[in-house]
Curated annotation (Swiss-Prot):
Component of the mitochondrial electron transport chain complex II composed of four subunits: a flavoprotein (Fp), an iron-sulfur protein (Ip), and a large cytochrome b (CybL) subunit and a small cytochrome b (CybS) subunit. There are 2 developmental stage-specific forms of complex II which have the Ip and CybL subunits in common. Complex II from the free-living larvae (aerobic environment) acts as a succinate dehydrogenase and is composed of the common subunit Ip and CybL and the stage specific subunits FpL and CybSL. Gene3D superfamilies: 3.10.20.30, Alpha-helical ferredoxin (1.10.1060.10). The keyword Ribosomal protein does not apply. It holds the Pfam family Fer4_17. It comes from the Eukaryota. Inhibited by the fungicide flutolanil. This is Succinate dehydrogenase [ubiquinone] iron-sulfur subunit, mitochondrial. It catalyses: a ubiquinone + succinate = a ubiquinol + fumarate; a rhodoquinone + succinate = a rhodoquinol + fumarate. Residues 1-21 form a transit peptide. The keyword Oxidoreductase applies. It comes from Ascaris suum. Pathway: Carbohydrate metabolism; tricarboxylic acid cycle; fumarate from succinate (eukaryal route): step 1/1.
Length: 282
């Protein structure tokens, strides 16, 4: 009985899916007064020999939200359900919908649609990354590099978890401002020419900023070891201060400054300050 029910449910699912595709295929072109054209990068690895292309979609701005992600969702729901992209929070927090819109790396969920209907908006996946499908880049290398910096607090003194807090003064905590807010969207790294050509060795702006976040943390005891892993000509020093990373960051952070601080620590121009003593009444 259960097997038969499963088979029926699967059949209904296939029928529903087929109806959805048929409806999308016959969707009428929008006829409103404010029709915006989007050219979207398309690539399907399941089509042998198929080459990437730009496909045009028209959207009625009077029946769509104000953000580019709203337009993408509308296109997927009403025109072409095969259009593939990442998205989650829809409010600039998760970093999932990072892509190249009108020539700039940004988040689709916080990028306003250009209201000039005479101009076509072109949308590509993040540049210089392998493309899985359409607007979905392969982030495996990026996340592997992030894991390589060991992005967690490391203590050399024995502590009993839950026994007490790790003290950090207000001034010490302020050094982390503008660092921990990074959402790992990779907009900055994908905008960096040095990362384009040396991604296998150069860690890139996003990962280096996260590395500095742990290096400078007064509670962390492994700054020397963290810096030692970057004592080569590529990990950090391939940054040529082009500043694309800072310009494109959707969170308005400054990866270039963090990389500069790492370089000064590596060359002994600076040293990490000793942590302030824990107050007696803490």
């Amino acid at each position: 009985m259960l097997r038969g029910s499963t088979s029926v449910c699967r059949s209904l699912e296939l029928v529903t899916q087929a109806a959805r595709y048929a409806s999308a295929a016959t969707a009428a072109a929008p006829t409103g007064k404010r029709i915006k054209t989007f050219e979207i990068y398309r690539f399907n690895p399941e089509e042998p020999g198929a080459k990437p292309k730009l496909q045009k979609f028209d959207v009625d701005l009077d029946k769509c939200g104000t953000m580019v992600l709203d337009a993408l969702i509308k296109i997927k729901n009403e025109v072409d359900p095969t259009l593939t992209f990442r998205r989650s929070c829809r409010e600039g927090i998760c970093g999932s919908c990072a892509m190249n819109i009108a020539g700039e790396n940004t988040l689709a969920c916080i990028c306003n649609i250009d209201q000039n209907t005479s101009k076509t908006t072109k949308i590509y996946p993040l540049p210089h990354m392998f493309v899985i499908k359409d607007l979905v880049p392969d982030m495996n290398l990026f996340y592997a590099q992030y894991a390589s910096i060991q992005p967690w607090l490391q203590k050399k003194t024995k502590i009993n978890l839950g026994e007490k807090q790790q003290y950090q003064s207000i001034k010490e905590q302020e050094k982390l401002d503008g660092l921990y807010e990074c959402i790992l969207c990779a907009c900055c790294s994908a905008s960096c020419p040095s990362y384009w050509w040396n991604a296998d060795k150069y860690l890139g702006p996003a990962v280096l900023m996260q590395a500095y976040r742990w290096i400078i943390d007064s509670r962390d005891d492994s700054a020397a070891e963290r810096l030692a892993r970057m004592q080569d000509g590529f990990s950090a020093f391939k940054c040529h201060t082009i500043m694309n990373c800072t310009k494109t960051c959707p969170k308005h952070l400054n990866p270039a400054r963090a990389i500069g601080e790492i370089k000064m620590l590596l060359t002994k121009m600076k040293t990490k300050p000793a942590p302030l003593p824990t107050p007696a009444n803490f």
